[in-house]
């Protein structure tokens, strides 16, 4: 038995939703610990695609799903998601969907600030999703954010919203030259959300720790990817939370000793949405082919993902930052049909070889990938369910990735469906 944290190893969009959905079958509790509705986790069951943005993917397996204190929650989006899932026949109640009373709430003024800032930056924008995630985390750090425990106290909530709107409206109108927000409308709208969500609000830390004491298996579901981490990512082209495995404790209220396994989700190639350096990016027919075959469009934004070869310099940093105990390789099938495959094993920058991912984006922008080339395969592998049945060149590719990464491959995904997966070793077995 083990408690597992699942993290993205690249720039997000690695296929975490599918893997979490599969692992949830053996889990008792599934927990989100950071991020907001800027994440989109896609699950395909019996040909039906379901995308969740806030509710943990485990809800489709009727598991106890928890939204930790490290998550920033847009209650409107959350309730829209609840209603959509209920309409699909998914059971959601106050027993299987629990929200931390300490979780921060995204307010309309956060979204207004997000849009106003991006508009003012113009060409220098960082590519935010505009959902108010960053401004909400800012208010949290400034100790003036609204938590669920505050939302459920009408007098406290009223006072906090009016004070916040006074400050935000000054910035919106005077500095950004944007429209103000209406505190009365916000209070009325969010009071209705409070009525529906109140039964779901609990102390998630207490629930989780009691579950662990009772021998329940917990799956912690990360959002985005390691290199979007606010501290360790390609700053400032990052998200506003810590996406690495170490944040699972702070973001959900459990101790480090209660996390046994760290499973990194590795897409068989690399993708990135939005701005920022991308050393292995392919801006040719191969890149277009991968983009089209892999259907590389953001589940949350619909934006086209930039595509490139697998980057082991990037992944070395990921393994080091997260302490990976295993990996799941996704979208291996997308590489089928290519004559040869490249794996980036180092960077070359102004005559020097770099083996570690640089923090300075000016340096990263100058980095050229040093490639190791391997033969590809032509066979359709979407029906393969055992590692030994994969084409020899596919096995060689995976073995080389495992060797370079220094962490065992435990799961291989060869298609979007729940059944298009092979388990090399059960992560819950440790």
Curated annotation (Swiss-Prot):
Residues noted as binding GTP in the record, renumbered to the chain: 12-18, 40-42, 305, 331-333, 413-415
Output the InterPro entries linked to this UniProt entry: Adenylosuccin_syn_GTP-bd, Adenylosuccin_syn_Lys_AS, Adenylosuccinate_synth_dom1, Adenylosuccinate_synth_dom2, Adenylosuccinate_synth_dom3, Adenylosuccinate_synthetase, P-loop_NTPase
An example GO BP is: IMP metabolic process
Q: What is its EC number?
A: 6.3.4.4
Q: Which cofactor does it need?
A: Mg(2+)
Q: In which pathway does it act?
A: Purine metabolism; AMP biosynthesis via de novo pathway; AMP from IMP: step 1/2
Q: Which reaction does it catalyse?
A: IMP + L-aspartate + GTP = N(6)-(1,2-dicarboxyethyl)-AMP + GDP + phosphate + 2 H(+)
Binding, IMP: 13-16, 38-41, 129, 143, 224, 239, 303
- What gene is behind this protein? purA
Name the UniProt record assigns to this protein: Adenylosuccinate synthetase
């Amino acid at each position: 038995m083990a408690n597992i944290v699942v993290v993205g190893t690249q720039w997000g969009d690695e296929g975490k939703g599918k893997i979490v959905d599969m692992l949830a079958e053996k889990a008792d509790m599934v927990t989100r610990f950071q991020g907001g509705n800027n994440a989109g986790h896609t699950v395909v069951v019996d040909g039906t695609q379901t995308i969740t943005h806030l509710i943990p993917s485990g809800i489709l397996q009727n598991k106890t799903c928890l939204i930790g204190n490290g998550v920033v929650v847009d209650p409107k989006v959350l309730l829209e998601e609840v209603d959509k899932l209920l309409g699909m026949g998914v059971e959601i109640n106050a027993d299987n969907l629990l929200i931390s009373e300490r979780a921060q709430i995204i307010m309309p003024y956060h979204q207004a600030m997000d849009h106003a800032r991006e508009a003012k930056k113009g060409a220098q924008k960082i590519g935010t999703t505009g959902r108010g995630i960053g401004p909400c985390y800012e208010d949290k750090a400034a100790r003036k954010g609204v938590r669920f425990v505050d939302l459920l106290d009408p007098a406290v909530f009223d006072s906090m919203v009016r004070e916040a709107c006074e400050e935000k409206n000054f910035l919106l109108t005077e500095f950004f030259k944007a429209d103000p927000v209406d505190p009365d409308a916000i209070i009325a709208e969010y009071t209705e959300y409070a009525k529906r969500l109140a039964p779901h609000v609990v102390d998630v830390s207490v629930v989780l720790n009691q579950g662990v004491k009772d021998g329940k298996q917990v799956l912690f579901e990360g959002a985005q990817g390691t290199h979007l981490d606010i501290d360790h990512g390609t700053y400032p082209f990052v998200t506003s939370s810590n996406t690495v495995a170490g944040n699972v404790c702070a973001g959900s209220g459990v101790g480090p000793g209660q996390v046994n396994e760290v499973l990194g989700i590795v897409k068989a190639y690399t993708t990135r949405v939005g701005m920022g350096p991308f050393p292995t990016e392919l801006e040719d027919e191969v890149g277009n082919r991968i983009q089209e075959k892999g259907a590389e469009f953001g589940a949350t934004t619909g934006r086209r993902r930039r595509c490139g070869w697998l980057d082991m310099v990037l992944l070395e940093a990921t393994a080091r930052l997260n302490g990976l105990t295993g990996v799941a390789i996704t979208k291996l099938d997308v590489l089928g049909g290519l004559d040869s495959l490249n794996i980036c094993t180092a960077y070359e920058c102004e005559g020097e070889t770099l083996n570690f991912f640089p923090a300075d984006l000016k340096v990263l922008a100058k980095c050229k990938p040093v490639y190791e080339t391997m033969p590809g395969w032509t066979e359709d592998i979407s029906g393969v369910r055992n590692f030994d049945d994969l084409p020899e060149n596919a096995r060689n590719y995976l073995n080389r990735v495992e060797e370079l990464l220094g962490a065992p491959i435990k799961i291989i995904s060869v298609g979007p469906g729940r059944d298009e997966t092979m388990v090399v070793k059960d992560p819950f077995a440790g």
